[in-house]
């Protein structure tokens, strides 16, 4: 999935809004098709923020908060446009979708948009990646999109960004993960440098994650600072498995992929050792 990151930079795969942008302005208008026909719920900053422990990047009042919901249908047949994405993306009842409210925009990339949402039932904040089905089919990335979810369901590691849920609407796919307000690149851009002890800790945690993934036959193929989130205690959370692959023992991957700004001359040599190059 696209990086669940609050970094404000410009790379090929992620383009986050500039600090100070009105997140209830231009970007909300483009998403009205997702929650058309529904009302809005007005809630003050104190009420929303009292239900979560993370510090929001944007310190504006977030109201009204639209519902993360596609237009409800009385009956849902299973046409090919839905069955293609099963079973990784099941169809969720409308009432379950009504429990999610949008708090803000985290990032917007070529494959989709990542939203910060409030789960009213759990009283917890999550990140939801929204991917148009049309883009998935146009770019012939159906297998890649389904494998991203399948791989994340196999992973259970303290330094990996955990998958909460995945489902589909009539026009979009939704991938919900835990929310982290900071990534390694944003932290580095803010402080300018890391102490040696911090670098050792980050490196040790990253190596533990990569060894764990490789033992499962999983290669990430897009390890970079933007895809390394930080939890509230400062520990790493590797995220964005959109380019990952599951390989059988001894198999190799030969696809040239990743983020253009990070590719080197040896990028064509893609395999499990490729993850060790940042």
UniProtKB/Swiss-Prot annotation:
KW Transferase (keyword) present: yes
Residues of the Protein kinase domain: 100-278
Family annotation (SUPFAM superfamilies): Protein kinase-like (PK-like)
GO terms, molecular function: ATP binding; protein serine kinase activity; protein serine/threonine kinase activity
InterPro entries for this protein: Kinase-like_dom_sf, Prot_kinase_dom, Ser/Thr_kinase_AS
Keywords carried by this UniProt record: ATP-binding, Kinase, Nucleotide-binding, Serine/threonine-protein kinase, Transferase
Catalytic-site annotation from UniProt: 222
EC number: 2.7.11.1
Class of enzymatic activity (EC top level): transferase
Reaction catalysed by this enzyme: L-seryl-[protein] + ATP = O-phospho-L-seryl-[protein] + ADP + H(+); L-threonyl-[protein] + ATP = O-phospho-L-threonyl-[protein] + ADP + H(+)
One Pfam family it belongs to: Pkinase
Annotated ATP binding sites: 106-114, 129
Stated family: Belongs to the protein kinase superfamily. Ser/Thr protein kinase family.
The name this protein goes by in its record: Ribosomal protein S6 kinase-related protein
Taxonomic source organism: Mus musculus
Classification of source organism: Eukaryota, Metazoa, Chordata, Craniata, Vertebrata
The gene coding this protein: Rskr
């Amino acid at each position: 999935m696209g990086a669940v990151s609050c970094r404000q930079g410009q790379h090929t795969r992620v383009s986050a809004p500039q600090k100070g942008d009105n997140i209830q302005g231009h970007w909300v208008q483009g998403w009205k098709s997702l929650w058309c026909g529904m009302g809005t719920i007005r809630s003050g900053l104190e009420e929303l923020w009292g239900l979560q422990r993370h510090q929001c990047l944007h310190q504006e009042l977030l109201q009204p908060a639209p519902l993360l919901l596609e237009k409800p249908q009385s009956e849902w047949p299973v046409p090919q446009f839905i069955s293609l994405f099963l079973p990784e993306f099941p169809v969720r009842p409308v009432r379950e979708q009504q429990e999610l409210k949008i708090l803000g925009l985290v990032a917007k990339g070529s494959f989709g948009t990542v939203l910060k949402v409030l789960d009213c039932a759990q009283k917890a904040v999550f990140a939801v990646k929204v991917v148009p089905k049309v883009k998935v089919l146009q770019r012939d990335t159906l297998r890649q999109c389904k494998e991203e979810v399948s791989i994340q369901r196999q992973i259970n590691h303290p330094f990996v960004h955990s998958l909460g849920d995945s489902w589909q609407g009539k026009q979009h796919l939704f991938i919900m993960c835990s929310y982290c307000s900071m990534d390694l690149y944003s932290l580095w851009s803010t402080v300018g440098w890391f102490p040696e002890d911090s670098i050792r800790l980050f490196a040790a945690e990253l190596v533990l994650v990569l060894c764990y993934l490789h033992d499962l036959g999983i290669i990430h193929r897009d390890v970079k600072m933007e895809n390394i989130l930080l939890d509230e205690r400062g520990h790493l959370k590797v995220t964005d498995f959109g380019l990952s692959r599951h390989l059988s023992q001894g198999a190799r991957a030969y696809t040239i992929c990743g983020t253009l700004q990070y590719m080197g001359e040896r990028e064509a040599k893609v395999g499990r050792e490729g993850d060790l190059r940042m």
